[in-house]
């Protein structure tokens, strides 16, 4: 179509000059339409180039048309006018045909653009949906992971917690019930038959507790590298691999089914329930560590063991008497047909009495008659000697441990009494010393804290000291804003001290080497006469903090400025100057801050000479630094001398070892060389003969 338009254009240019100006306008309009059509068609390069050539020719053609149209006559115009009109109609019709195509293209382009927009929207919506689905999947996966973790990490009982300890108490009750009542019911028939309903209830309640105990064991954590294991599989595996699982399993075997075959008069079929005794021992052990009266608990525990052994021995004695026959001889239990000995209570009490006399060997019992009776009595005597000797020895050691602290304290008092008597100390002084010791004992202050805490690691010792003393140390003004590390260092250096009534903690003019914090008691700031009181210091007060800082410019120097006296018995914490300076060596900023605070306090009290304080460094400080450097140099020299001596000794030892090795290897080397020389001499004549 484009080529047709161009051909018509060329033909139109060659038409004689009969075309009117209106036709020229139409031609221009057609030209513009052709250009737009050519610009829309990207693939037809040839048509575009042809159109460009025609475009270059059009100005000349248009000018020629105008000139010719002006020259030609109207008759000529009329002659050529029908052809031009026909040509114009052809071109116009082609242009009209082209216009709907262009509109269609534009519509298609609009549709394609709108379609692209819709597709982009759909793609973005799809992406959003996919992202939402991924988020949902991630949430579901996280929820599954959490559920799996919850399944794996089930509720675990801490073996060091109160819940586990309370459960041990619950399981101890059925264990003690079985250990006392099963043997008694098996030996005393009336006890089993008269109270059968109660025994059935108690038996199966204890069985339920036993089963629950096995479940609790599978939920009881254990420490692995200091961390509590909470995984269910590991807990179950740990329990199953233990010997206690086998004993627990044997203890819950339903042996009660034998009741249907043997009858209800055989409670001894439940003897497997006694295998759970380890839980009772564990409960006693944990109670001993928890109680504040361990010695009393140990004694009561031993008494309980004695009673259980006597109880078992009494039951065995009664069963042996039943097997031999009641009343057949003087050793066995009397005839039960006698109303006096037919009651259940009398049977048990008589057997218990006989067992106690036999095992403790403190009374006379009827002599045995039969061989079986002799054997039983001999076994009882051996058990009594071995067990009760051990028990009595333990009780004796417990009692001695209970009195060990008192005996040690009394030994100190006796030693001081002997010393005062030897030195002829006055009676008043002796009374004061004895009263002071009585105060320490009654208030339980005889314990040496360092001796008690020396077995703990440094971390635990520091935590205990922080819990006990940190709040007290923070009350001191100069330590209020100090670093936590410095406070911990100072807390570990606090020393407890006790003063009796009338004791002077410090006097005016004394050199201040310590500062004091009042823990308990009252102190008075008194005049020189020791009677007039200016101020009374109570719990939480402190004094002497300025003197240990040795602040330059202090008018008092490091001297005490007041007399402080104890009114009653007073407990103080003491911090020495050396300990403070040792701690401040690692905290130079804190040292500067403490000195500034001390200067401010002295300025408020008017005890600071500003000129001296603002002066340069004190020569004394320089001397102290020089002495410290000299000491460090001396220390390095001694270390160097020691290392040099060790080096020389090692060198001497190496020389000695080398000489020994040379002496040992020299004959061997000589023999080897001689052998080599001999072989060389033999080979020479052989070579000559061959030549």
From Swiss-Prot:
Residues 57-76, 112-151 have a biased composition (Basic and acidic residues). Gene3D superfamilies: 1.10.287.70, 1.20.5.170, Helix hairpin bin, Jelly Rolls. It catalyses: Ca(2+)(in) = Ca(2+)(out); Na(+)(in) = Na(+)(out); K(+)(in) = K(+)(out); NH4(+)(in) = NH4(+)(out). One of its GO terms (cellular component) is plasma membrane. It comes from the Eukaryota. Residues 361-364 are annotated as: Selectivity filter. Pfam families: CLZ (PF16526), cNMP_binding (PF00027), Ion_trans (PF00520). Residues 404-480 are annotated as: C-linker. One of its GO terms (biological process) is monoatomic cation transmembrane transport. Residues 31-151 are annotated as: Disordered. Glycans are attached at residue 328. It is a multi-pass membrane protein. Keywords: Calcium, Calcium channel, Calcium transport, cAMP, cAMP-binding, Cell membrane, cGMP, cGMP-binding, Coiled coil, Glycoprotein, Ion channel, Ion transport, Ligand-gated ion channel, Membrane, Nucleotide-binding, Sensory transduction, Sodium, Sodium channel, Sodium transport, Transmembrane, Transmembrane helix, Transport, Vision. The record marks 388, 392 as: Central gate. Residues 191-200, 266-270, 321-343 are extracellular. Residues 484-604 are annotated as: Cyclic nucleotide-binding domain. It is found in: Cell membrane. PROSITE patterns: CNMP_BINDING_1 (PS00888), CNMP_BINDING_2 (PS00889), CNMP_BINDING_3 (PS50042). Residues 39-56 have a biased composition (Acidic residues). Residues 1-168, 222-246, 290-296, 404-691 are cytoplasmic. Residues 622-676 form a coiled coil. The C-terminal coiled-coil domain mediates homotrimerization of CNGA1 subunit. The cyclic nucleotide-binding domain (CNBD) comprises three helices and a beta-roll of eight beta-strands from CNGA1 and CNGB1 subunits. Upon cNMP binding transmits the conformational changes to the C-linker domain of the S6 helix to open the ion conduction pathway. Forms heterotetrameric channels composed of CNGA1 and CNGB1 subunits with 3:1 stoichiometry. May also form cyclic nucleotide-activated homotetrameric channels, that are efficiently activated by saturating cGMP, but poorly activated by saturating cAMP compared to the heterotetramer with CNGB1. The channel binds Ca(2+)-bound CALM1 via CaM1 and CaM2 regions of the CNGB1 subunit; this interaction modulates the affinity of the channel for cNMPs in response to intracellular Ca(2+) levels. Belongs to the cyclic nucleotide-gated cation channel (TC 1.A.1.5) family. CNGA1 subfamily. Pore-forming subunit of the rod cyclic nucleotide-gated channel. Mediates rod photoresponses at dim light converting transient changes in intracellular cGMP levels into electrical signals. In the dark, cGMP levels are high and keep the channel open enabling a steady inward current carried by Na(+) and Ca(2+) ions that leads to membrane depolarization and neurotransmitter release from synaptic terminals. This is Cyclic nucleotide-gated channel alpha-1.
């Amino acid at each position: 179509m484009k080529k047709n338009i161009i051909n018509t254009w060329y033909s139109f240019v060659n038409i004689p000059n009969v075309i009117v100006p209106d036709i020229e306008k139409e031609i221009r309009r057609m030209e513009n339409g052709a250009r737009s059509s050519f610009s829309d068609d990207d693939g037809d390069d040839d048509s575009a180039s042809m159109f460009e050539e025609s475009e270059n020719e059009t100005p000349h053609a248009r000018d020629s048309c105008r000139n010719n149209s002006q020259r030609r006559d109207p008759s000529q115009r009329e002659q050529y006018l029908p052809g031009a009109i026909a040509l114009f109609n052809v071109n116009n019709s082609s242009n009209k045909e082209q216009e709907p195509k262009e509109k269609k293209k534009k519509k298609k382009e609009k549709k394609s653009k709108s379609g692209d927009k819709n597709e982009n929207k759909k793609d973005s919506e799809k992406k959003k949906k996919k992202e939402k689905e991924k988020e949902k999947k991630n949430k579901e996966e996280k929820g599954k992971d959490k559920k799996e973790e919850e399944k794996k990490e089930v509720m675990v009982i801490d073996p060091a917690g109160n819940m586990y300890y309370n459960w041990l108490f619950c399981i101890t009750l059925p264990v003690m019930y079985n250990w006392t009542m099963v043997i008694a019911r098996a030996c005393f028939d009336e006890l089993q038959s008269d109270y059968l309903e109660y025994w059935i209830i108690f038996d199966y309640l204890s069985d339920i507790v036993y089963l629950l105990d096995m479940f609790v064991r599978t939920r009881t954590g254990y420490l692995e590298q200091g961390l509590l294991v909470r995984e269910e599989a590991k807990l179950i595996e740990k329990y199953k691999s233990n010997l206690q699982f086998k004993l627990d399993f044997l203890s819950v075997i339903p042996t009660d089914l034998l009741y249907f075959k043997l009858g209800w008069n055989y409670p001894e079929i439940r003897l497997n329930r006694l295998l759970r005794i380890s839980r009772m021992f564990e409960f006693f052990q944990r109670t001993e560590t928890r109680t504040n009266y361990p010695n009393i608990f140990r004694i009561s525990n031993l008494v309980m063991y004695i009673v259980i052994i006597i109880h078992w021995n009494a039951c065995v004695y009664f069963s042996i008497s039943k097997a031999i026959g009641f009343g057949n001889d003087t050793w066995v239990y009397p005839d039960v047909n006698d109303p006096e000995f037919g009651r259940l209570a009398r049977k048990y009490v008589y057997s218990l009495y006989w067992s106690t006399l036999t095992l403790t060997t403190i009374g006379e019992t009827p002599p045995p008659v039969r061989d079986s009776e002799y054997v039983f009595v001999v076994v009882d005597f051996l058990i009594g000697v071995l067990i009760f000797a051990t028990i009595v020895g333990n009780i004796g050691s417990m009692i001695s441990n209970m009195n060990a602290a008192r005996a040690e304290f009394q030994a100190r008092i006796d030693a001081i009494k002997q010393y005062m008597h030897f030195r002829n100390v006055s009676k008043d002084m002796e009374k004061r010393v004895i009263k002071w010791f009585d105060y320490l004992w009654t208030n339980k202050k005889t314990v040496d804290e360092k001796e008690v805490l020396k077995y703990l690691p440094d971390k635990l010792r520091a935590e205990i000291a922080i819990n006990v003393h940190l709040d007290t140390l923070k009350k001191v003004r100069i330590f209020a804003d100090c670093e936590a590390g410095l406070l911990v260092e100072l807390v570990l250096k606090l020393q407890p001290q006790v003063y009796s009534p009338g004791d002077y903690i410090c006097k005016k003019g004394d050199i201040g080497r310590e500062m004091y914090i009042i823990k308990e008691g009252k102190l008075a700031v008194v005049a020189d006469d020791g009677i007039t009181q200016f101020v009374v210091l109570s719990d939480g007060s402190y004094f002497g903090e300025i003197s240990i800082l040795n602040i330059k410019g202090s008018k008092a120097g490091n001297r005490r400025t007041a007399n402080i006296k104890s009114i009653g018995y007073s407990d103080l914490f003491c911090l020495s100057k050396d300990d403070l300076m040792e701690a401040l060596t690692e905290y130079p900023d804190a040292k500067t801050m403490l000195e500034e605070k001390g200067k401010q306090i002295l300025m408020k009290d008017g005890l600071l000479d500003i000129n001296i304080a603002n002066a340069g460094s004190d020569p004394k400080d320089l001397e102290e630094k020089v002495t410290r450097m000299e000491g460090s140099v001396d220390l390095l020299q001694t270390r160097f001398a020691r290392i040099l001596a060790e080096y020389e000794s090692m060198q001497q030892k190496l020389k000695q070892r080398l000489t020994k090795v040379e002496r040992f290897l020299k004959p061997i080397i000589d023999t080897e060389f001689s052998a080599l020389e001999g072989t060389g001499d033999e080979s020479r004549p052989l070579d000559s003969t061959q030549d």
